[in-house]
Amino acid sequence: MTAQKWPALRVESGQATAVKDNVVVEEAIKLYLNDELVTELVATPTNLEELGVGFVVDEALAKDIQSVRSSSGVVAVYARSARKRPWKLQSSGGMGTLSDLPKVSSNITLTPDNVLSVIRETTSELWTRTGAVHCSVLFLEDELLVKRDDIGRHNTIDKVVGFAILNEIDLSRCIIGCTGRQPAGMVYKVANAGVPVIVSKAAPTYNGILTATDTGITLICFARGDRFTVYANPQRIRNLSGEAAIGPLTCASP
């Protein structure tokens, strides 16, 4: 169950009306890797096996996933080899440090129309009902593969990556579209998955931009209507016009 009806009092211009509102449901999820507790997450209780697999890969805990199962608020992931590192919860919802950034290599390119097509898919039915969830989508080049929503923006990334891994999809040919802001921890997740492009409706942070630049990810934010802003690695965007479309990103001195 992702939402429940709840009695509430809606007030407009001082006039009160009794309503039954759709309210999103969340649950505490315990995630185990090779029978060892890794973390506890608060998540929308759907697609939990994808969430577990995606989290393990996106946090660089393991890549060679053997199996996954979920039951009663517990997700158990099994991998042939798992890294053991001192983990620290990040404010972005990620874990670990950003000291060993991966490099993302891909020949994928996209047009402005591709970018806007991606972001148009990030409105979900659950968000329309509750207004309380984030959404991420996964495109294989220009084909929409999957859409996942969750109360946590980081969980939506883990879910679409988990879907790709469980379905043996080449993530180096993929684009992730999402609704959440992009701090370093979010970009780090996508880099560990090997996805070369992030398209977001929301803002980046300074460290998010630095992380995208260093990992080789094309970071596109404020994608709304017919516009967007490219903050890192714009070489993957083709069919651009204007003088600024030529050459690397530069910034005038303040």
Could you tell me what each predicted segment is?
Residues 1-140, 146-147:
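Intrinsically disordered, low-complexity regions enriched in acidic/Ser/Thr/Pro/Gln residues
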Residues 43, 148-152, 204:
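Short alpha-helix boundary/capping segments
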Residues 62-64, 169-171, 243-244:
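Short, intrinsically disordered/low-complexity patches at protein termini
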Residues 124-169, 175-176:
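Histidine/lysine/aspartate-rich catalytic loop segments that bind and position anionic ligands
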Residues 154-230, 236-239:
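Feature captures the catalytic cores and cofactor-binding loops of soluble hydro-lyases/lyases
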Residues 234-249:
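A charged, well-structured terminal subsegment
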Residues 250-254:
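Active-site/ligand-binding-proximal alpha/beta "capping" segment
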